[in-house]
Amino acid sequence: DNSGTAKEGVGRTYTGVDGYCPLAAYLGTQGYCLELALRPGVQHSASGTQLDLKRIVPMAQRLSAGGGKAPILVRLDAGFDSADLMREMAACNSAGLPRVDWLIKWNPRKTEVATLAALLDANQATRWQHPRAGKRVTVWDEQVRIEGFERPMRRVMRLTERTIDAKGQLLIEPQWVLEGWSTTLAGRQFDAQAIITLYEGHGAHEQFHSEFKTDLDLERLPSGKFDTNALVCALAALAMNILRLLGQAGLHGPDAPVRHEAKRRRIKTVMQELIYRAARLIDHGRRRILGLGANDRSAQAFARLHGQLALAGCG
């Protein structure tokens, strides 16, 4: 949100505010940022994304090939439901590199949901689940064919019908919600519910994005020039990754400050424990000493992490 400014590139975004339309790509579950590309606010999510994928996906493949050689799953929201983007990702599959699959939220566009609901209701093969009174859900798979694309792909569909809302109010007409997820993951390894669960993890993307805006204070970018703000975003991604690495290495050991168990720590926590430290500059015996103190709760973790970085040639 950069409303109330005349900054270059600020425009009306799909969320209804004046700002930018950044593209953020993260690798793994810890929030390591592969790219934070700044784009004009009026730009559509999928516009120009092919060029971004040409950089991002091979980068993820190289990182995976240098480690556990794990396959890559590209997870995208409905704004990227595009056959051109799928072809671009398919082109990244080559010998010697980790396999690339994708999971994209389907955009129903002009699908007649009421007509589809009537067809499913008339089909005896449809299996409905009833999680509560006045609500039923059905999930099914269907094969998808894209012109010029030979790789098998399927779409997991879910239709939710409500005749009573969550508060017990009877509805005059049924309410339907149609959702879908397009994927190249094989059904024998990932059933429909597994695909839905995999996509639910996409919510962590918003958590990572909020850390840029709050913890790194990038809610409103500093410059009126678009290129300068794009550089700020690139440097912010670098800073984010450094802080992630410090947090993973320094705040999960037995000597880490006592906190609740977690697989990762927020950037704000990493800065509070390892960056914002009281110190004294001491001149003694023709030497200048930086005294960091040894009695605060993160002193041991800080000393251990500093030693590890020094041995690695970073100190």
Where are these regions (language model features)?
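Short, conserved catalytic/metal-binding motifs centered on acidic residues
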Residues: 1, 31, 72-81, 102, ...
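Active-site-proximal, Lys/Arg-enriched surface segment
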Residues: 1-25
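Acidic, His- and aromatic-enriched active-site or binding-groove loops in soluble protein domains
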Residues: 13-22, 54, 92-111
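Active-site beta-loop-alpha junctions of metal-dependent nucleic acid enzymes
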Residues: 38-62
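Acidic, metal-coordinating catalytic cores used for nucleic-acid/nucleotide bond scission
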Residues: 74-83, 108-110, 227
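An anionic, glycine-rich sequence signature occurring as long contiguous blocks
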Residues: 98-210, 214, 301-315
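Short amphipathic alpha-helical "interface-anchor" segments enriched in bulky aromatics
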Residues: 192-231, 235, 239-246
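A short, flexible helix-boundary coil/loop motif
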Residues: 243-315
